[in-house]
């Protein structure tokens, strides 16, 4: 819906996700682990906005480690159909092969008009790295 600056100026959003973000002086910085429909997702957050989801807006994930949207409600990001909004930075797609495969599938389906299943890929090294990150961050 909107972004409200630290000075109180309201800037309209695109209307895709039902979220309102308030700019803050304090930053939320650090590694994040989320529980999502795509499995655990790891990343890094560095933001000063505090985002609140609208009543019917689904979050991208639930915070297992980190601050998330606002440091208090346990949500991170927002998802509507094939749109994901998130504060996560870093190598999000290589670090989360299941999420990457899902996004590739969505894009291919939108491009071709039919469901597309990614071919068999050897994601073993990526899966091991992902599991190591999740385990380390939740320890």
Show where each model-derived region lies.
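Cysteine-nucleophile active-site neighborhood
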Residues: 1-40
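Short, glycine- and charge-enriched coil/turn segments that flank and shape catalytic ligand pockets
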Residues: 5-9, 37-40, 66-74, 109-117
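Hydrophobic/aromatic beta-strand patches that form the interior of the parallel beta-sheet core
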Residues: 15, 44, 84-86
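Acyltransferase
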Residues: 79-139
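Short, acidic Gly/Pro/Ser/Thr-rich loop/turn segments
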Residues: 21-24, 50-53, 91-95
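Catalytic beta-strand/loop cores that center a nucleophilic Ser/Cys/Thr
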Residues: 33-81
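Fold-independent oxyanion-binding glycine-rich loops
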Residues: 1, 19-20, 46-49, 88-90
């Amino acid at each position: 819906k909107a972004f409200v600056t630290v000075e109180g100026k309201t800037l309209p959003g695109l209307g895709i996700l039902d979220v309102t973000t308030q700019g803050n002086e304090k930053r939320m910085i650090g590694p994040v682990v989320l529980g999502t429909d795509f499995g655990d997702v790891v990343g890094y957050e560095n933001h000063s906005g505090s985002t609140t989801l609208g009543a019917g807006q689904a979050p991208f994930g639930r915070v297992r480690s980190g601050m998330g949207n606002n440091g208090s409600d346990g949500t991170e990001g927002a998802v509507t159909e094939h749109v994901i909004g998130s504060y996560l930075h870093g190598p999000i797609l290589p670090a989360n092969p299941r999420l990457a495969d899902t996004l590739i599938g969505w894009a291919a389906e939108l491009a071709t008009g039919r469901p597309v299943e990614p071919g068999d890929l050897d994601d073993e090294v990526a899966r091991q790295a992902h599991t190591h990150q999740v385990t380390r961050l939740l320890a």
